[in-house]
């Protein structure tokens, strides 16, 4: 086959793929219809010598024909307000949307499969802050304390998204993602040089489980989580707490008499505290004796005069009479 014949064949196949993709798009069908037996028979009847387009060729044509959309908001992107992302950067952004915006992980997986990974620049500021907003941190000053507690979740979602491509997750991928994620998180909150080594060790701990040739992280579904909780609750032992007994006073303070005090003193003696009781009694008797021995000393007659049973100070008029 000469060069011109090969060119005509390639153009014919290209036109076939384009027309078939338009037909599938307008009819709302899926690209997998090219694998149906009835379609293959119909296509072979029209032109037995023409090659049948494959599903990847149809999907690629559909992507080229459809406008490029942002992987974050899904809106059409413009060349001056959007950037093309690598798989690593796109995975990090999609991971942030899954964790911070409660995005469906399956939707993030579908986005990462696109050939054109573009994102609007207007989302970058919110994407950078979503990790801290999710932890309800007031400012970015203490952000470096929060990133280590969230790094494990990022690793799990990132691994799930990347593994959806069917690629083997190697140590090189772990190191690559680690460097990108650390630079991504270090954008907020300056770390002192004396603390950087210590905090880097905490960051390294988040990747210990990922640092292997084949990393498989199981994402538990809500049903599995509920089953795990019920399994845990079965092992719990129910403990019945008995109410604490409280005793109320039968008498108020005003109801106590001297006889009650004597009775309580006798009980104390019977219970093995005779020495303490005797000391208390001696001290009480001593106070009584001192009070009875004290006599009222009337003031000197020079300054006071006795009037109707009590002593009153002498006034100036009384001094004159005297």
Curated annotation (Swiss-Prot):
Gene Ontology biological process terms, A to Z: positive regulation of gene expression; protein localization to nucleus; protein stabilization; regulation of translation; vulval development
Transmembrane spans: none
Basic and acidic residues composition bias: residue spans: 275-304
Region of interest (Disordered), residue spans: 264-322
Localization, UniProt: Nucleus
Pfam families on file: Lin-15B (PF25375)
Any one Gene Ontology cellular component term annotated for this protein: nucleus
Free-text tissue specificity from the UniProt record: Widely expressed throughout embryonic development. Expressed in the six multipotent ventral ectodermal blast cells, P3.p-P8.p, which generate the vulva and in their descendants throughout vulval development.
Phenotype of null mutants: Greatly reduced nuclear accumulation of lin-15a protein but no effect on mRNA levels.
Highest taxon in the source lineage: Eukaryota
UniProt keyword annotations, A-Z: Nucleus, Translation regulation
Function field: Required for translation, stability and/or localization of lin-15a.
Name of this chain's protein: Protein lin-56
């Amino acid at each position: 086959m000469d060069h011109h014949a090969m060119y005509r064949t390639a153009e014919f196949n290209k036109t076939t793929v384009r027309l078939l993709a338009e037909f599938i798009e307008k009819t709302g069908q899926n690209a997998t219809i090219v694998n149906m037996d009835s379609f293959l028979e119909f296509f072979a009847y029209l032109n037995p010598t023409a090659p049948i387009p494959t599903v990847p060729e149809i999907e690629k044509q559909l992507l080229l024909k459809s406008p490029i959309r942002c992987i974050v908001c899904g809106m059409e992107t413009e060349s001056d307000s959007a950037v093309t992302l690598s798989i690593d950067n796109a995975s990090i952004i999609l991971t942030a949307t899954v964790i911070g915006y409660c995005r469906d992980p399956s939707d993030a997986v579908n986005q990462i499969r696109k050939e054109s990974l573009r994102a609007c620049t207007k989302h970058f500021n919110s994407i950078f802050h979503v990790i801290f907003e999710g932890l309800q941190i007031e400012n970015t000053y203490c952000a470096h304390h929060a990133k280590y507690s969230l790094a494990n979740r990022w690793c799990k979602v990132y691994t799930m998204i990347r593994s959806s491509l069917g690629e083997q997750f190697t140590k090189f991928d772990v190191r690559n993602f680690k460097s990108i994620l650390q630079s991504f998180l270090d954008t907020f909150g300056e770390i002192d040089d004396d603390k950087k080594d210590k905090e880097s060790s905490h960051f390294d701990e988040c990747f210990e489980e990922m640092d292997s040739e084949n990393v498989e992280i199981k994402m538990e579904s809500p049903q599995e989580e509920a089953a795990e909780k019920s399994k845990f609750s079965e092992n719990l032992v129910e403990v019945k707490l008995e109410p604490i007994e409280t005793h109320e006073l039968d008498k108020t303070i005003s109801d106590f008499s001297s006889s009650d005090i004597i009775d309580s003193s006798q009980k104390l003696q019977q219970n093995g505290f005779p020495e303490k009781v005797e000391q208390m009694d001696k001290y009480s008797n001593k106070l009584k004796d001192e009070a009875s021995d004290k006599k009222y000393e009337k003031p000197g007659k020079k300054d006071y005069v006795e009037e109707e049973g009590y002593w009153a100070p002498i006034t100036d008029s009384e001094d004159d009479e005297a």
